[in-house]
A protein has these predicted regions:
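Conserved, single-site charged/polar hotspot
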Residues: 1-150
Length: 150
């Protein structure tokens, strides 16, 4: 689902973060080990079953060889993967492939998918874009105000 607060609703736009090493990532994990963490046998596939308007998965379906399924949030999956030693940066999985007991996941992104992209903001600043414009790109509709002083 999308956020009802306009400045936090996410943006579907090109970003200079595409040059970052975390823009696209690949990780491998034992299908059996992952299955054990989520109450399945050997996990053979992971597919998005629910997405927000910007195609970022909000629910992922894990399926084992017997056809049993478990739905999890991207955050839960990232936590399960991290517990197994994976370096997956986000739950935004673009592709999963199972071969000889190993589940290979290809994904995108690093953060939570809402608000300011740190890598993109840094790249824009290096290109001379001012902080006000960077904030406006990241948080459309937000107003900058001073809330301290005399």
């Amino acid at each position: 689902t999308s956020n009802a607060v306009a400045p936090l609703s996410g943006q579907g736009r090109p970003c200079p973060c595409q040059k970052s090493g975390r823009y696209r990532w690949t990780t491998k994990v034992s299908g059996k080990s992952l299955g054990g963490r989520v109450g399945l046998q050997t996990v053979r596939s992971i597919k998005p079953v629910q997405s927000n308007p910007w195609a970022r998965a909000t629910k992922l379906r894990l399926q084992d060889a017997q056809g049993s399924v478990v739905d999890v949030s991207p955050e839960k999956l990232r936590n399960h993967l991290a517990a197994l030693g994976s370096k997956a940066f986000s739950g935004w999985i673009l592709k999963s492939q199972y071969q000889q007991g190993v589940l290979t996941l290809e994904g995108a992104g690093f953060g939570h998918g809402v608000g300011m992209c740190q890598y993109g903001s840094e790249a824009r600043a290096r290109d001379g874009v001012g902080w006000r414009e960077i904030l406006a790109l990241s948080y459309p509709g937000a107003k900058i105000a001073t809330n301290w002083g005399p």
